[in-house]
Amino acid sequence: MCDVLMQPVRTPRPSTNLRSKPLRPTGDGGVFPRLGRLIVRRPWVVIAFWVALAGLLAPTVPSLDAISQRHPVAILPSDAPVLVSTRQMTAAFREAGLQSVAVVVLSDAKGLGAADERSYKELVDALRRDTRDVVMLQDFVTTPPLRELMTSKDNQAWILPVGLPGDLGSTQSKQAYARVADIVEHQVAGSTLTANLTGPAATVADLNLTGQRDRSRIEFAITILLLVILLIIYRNPITMVLPLITIGMSVVVAQRLVAIAGLAGLGIANQSIIFMSGMMVGAGTDYAVFLISRYHDYLRQGADSDQAVKKALTSIGKVIAASAATVAITFLGMVFTQLGILKTVGPMLGISVAVVFFAAVTLLPALMVLTGRRGWIAPRRDLTRRFWRSSGVHIVRRPKTHLLASALVLVILAGCAGLARYNYDDRKTLPASVESSIGYAALDKHFPSNLIIPEYLFIQSSTDLRTPKALADLEQMVQRVSQVPGVAMVRGITRPAGRSLEQARTSWQAGEVGSKLDEGSKQIAAHTGDIDKLAGGANLMASKLGDVRAQVNRAISTVGGLIDALAYLQDLLGGNRVLGELEGAEKLIGSMRALGDTIDADASFVANNTEWASPVLGALDSSPMCTADPACASARTELQRLVTARDDGTLAKISELARQLQATRAVQTLAATVSGLRGALATVIRAMGSLGMSSPGGVRSKINLVNKGVNDLADGSRQLAEGVQLLVDQVKKMGFGLGEASAFLLAMKDTATTPAMAGFYIPPELLSYATGESVKAETMPSEYRDLLGGLNVDQLKKVAAAFISPDGHSIRYLIQTDLNPFSTAAMDQIDAITAAARGAQPNTALADAKVSVVGLPVVLKDTRDYSDHDLRLIIAMTVCIVLLILIVLLRAIVAPLYLIGSVIVSYLAALGIGVIVFQFLLGQEMHWSIPGLTFVILVAVGADYNMLLISRLREEAVLGVRSGVIRTVASTGGVITAAGLIMAASMYGLVFASLGSVVQGAFVLGTGLLLDTFLVRTVTVPAIAVLVGQANWWLPSSWRPATWWPLGRRRGRAQRTKRKPLLPKEEEEQSPPDDDDLIGLWLHDGLRL
């Protein structure tokens, strides 16, 4: 089909012998002529070199699969803001297992029961025993409060988050995940529970496993497609096999070289390996088609096989080198990007293209030498040249029509690219049948979408934030955050349940005080009668104490008489002397009877009137004023003795003495009388001593003090009654005031509910205990255990441990939103949350704090930001590299400009087709990595066809651009078509992958290559070249070498002067190839490839 597609066209030469001028070096100089001679002389050496190289690398260098497991690709750079904040939060809270998390979903469609819970506990125990692979486990066995959160509303599923060691995607994390998966499968087997593993760690594991499974299937599909296309093109099995042998050998070598780069630190992703295989097959086959087609051209012109190989390598080698350099340099330039997938795939593809290029210009020519000498790869008749010649004629005749039609199609398709919506959710790239996808489906069925995707507001400060003021400022900050659209709840130290801590609001606290005041007011009102009784009792006591004073005064007078009589009796009868004299003093008998009568009367009165002494003594005992007054205290002591004398019978004994005196008779013997009196008198004297009456004067003074104390008590009781009455009046007034105050405070509690009105305050004592900053919470006073009627310190302590770092310098809040955490809306929300939080910082305790958001939406947002940055970098870098190479190759300015423009439009059109197919028809958003990766490949590969087309056009334009376009389209149409089909087939082979991102990328690349092959290179670019004319080759005079002159313009004028036909058909068919081929690089100093 393409055997003679590269056959040069002989056209009539101008009469001027331009070829005699030293414009160009002959075909004998340069790298490729010498390389061709070497290969023709030593083909077996070249083949042996490649076989030895592959044989050396294959057993000594680990496979690319093994290296991809050791050196996985981190999507974001290590200094990405979200990763920095995550590491800081992990360090501040001394946590592990946050970077790599797997989630076990345990479900029972019949409802969770006791048997399920036993299985759950056994699984938890097994996981806790695996301390190597499990660094964090959130279960409700050890933390009962988590039960409600970890149980679905329909009571059919539990979730069990498991933290794994290492970063997400690391070798350590992958190995730990595999062992944890085995534990889960073993423990749940045979139970009523169904276990599914999901979460970020499971997603990464499934991405790697799916990529590995897809690779062999993709390679097989690509091989079959290439065999079919090559068989159609060459219709020769040997010719068809040669490119495959070359590509197979180059793949082995390239994979081991990339593995060496991986050992040196280059990250390897499974998706990159897949694209690497497709790119190597496509590029290698393209280079083989270019070389074999030119080889067939020279064979048709009569050259033998060895000469044809040398000439083909000399002429087309330069184009292949320029094409490979464009692609490789562009790919290597991707090392300057930030995203891991782009940063690593660039060097991988660059190395691969370089290996394929060297195999195409060394191994393939050597194989062609050996097979060509035996005539195994002879060309077949061209079947498409007439079609492409006719196409060229139509374009030359109506260039504007063809340009407008093709441009309209491209612009419409490119416009669809602007409607693309990009997906950053890697879950959607996986097939629904993998383990993590099944787990996510179970989660979506039983739980909210954002349950296992935590998002934190992280605040770091140089000062301790465990103060009432800082917490109040934090509450104001998160209150603003909670008002951001889409934020459903913000939980943290100041709002454990997602709402501002009610007990810490000053309005609530004022309301509590008001409640207490209202309670006091009601109690006062309810006990008004009791208070009145108190006042009446005080008045009654004062009245009774007045009566007691009167009785005491009367009793004191009688006691005074008794004391005088006893004193007289003591003086009269005291001692043995007096008693001795009684026997001779009968005259005293009458006096003794009279004295007995007096004593009996007084003693009886005292005994009958001392009931007042006990209450008086009790009042004096409880009086601090009497205790402080020495005189009152002494009188209280004497009164105590009087009460004691009454109680212990002393007064009774005095009465007995009186009765004996009264009983004295004259008929009695004096001795008997005296003997009885002596005994009685001795008893009385002892009793008087116990009463302190040994000194009558002292007793009388003490009795006077008692009298005075009773008078003071009576006076004081009257004053007490007046004071109690005053107190009662004041309490009643205070009760009315408490009612008014409580009404005001309760109204404030009910109405001041907004943060600005309510305020926020946690007492320092409670905060100190709760955060463990001072005394342990268990030792705090009971009045703080349940401060202000509800703020329990034990609950607050658990909350503080989760949201306040041990040093108090970092605080985080858990943010729950109504949005899908993988959606672009969730990513856009991050800026709003951050702005709201930072807007609350000025003039607060948080003014110098660092505020950031941590979580998956932030990771995806940073991924999008880096992707946008990298896409701009890739576009600028790729355009500059390709443009510079085209300028150097063509030694012109205008043609490279519209060529690069056509490549960009072609890329946008291909992306637009992808949007139409996947987004509009299939309802899938485009994966975020598609624009950057496809741009590099489409522009770089499109540059290959540009170089082949425009270089041949410049060669053929010596007799005019219009005729040059016809001959160029006729001669290169088949080659470009074949190359485009082969490269597109290589890309379409990736459609057999299971990963959605690979399928989308493959479709866009394959479609873009076909679009570039059949529309841009065969219609749009030739039409532009015809319209631009000789200006295609314009170059500023300052850039022109000394020997440069516009060949096309001078020869074109000569041709137009002669008015020759555009296509001298006979000469065209017989024209030999031009040894001094204009295609390739040529510098004025004589150096060339």
Swiss-Prot record:
Highest taxon, organism lineage: Bacteria
Membrane topology: Multi-pass membrane protein
Segments passing through the bilayer: 44-64, 222-242, 257-277, 316-336, 349-369, 400-420, 555-575, 874-894, 898-918, 930-950, 973-993, 996-1016
Subcellular location: Cell membrane
Compositional bias segments (type: Acidic residues): 1066-1078
Keywords per UniProt: Cell membrane, Membrane, Transmembrane, Transmembrane helix
One GO cellular component term noted in the UniProt record for this chain: plasma membrane
Region entry Disordered, spans: 1-26, 1056-1078
Name the record gives this protein: Probable transport protein MmpL8
Lineage: Bacteria, Bacillati, Actinomycetota, Actinomycetes, Mycobacteriales
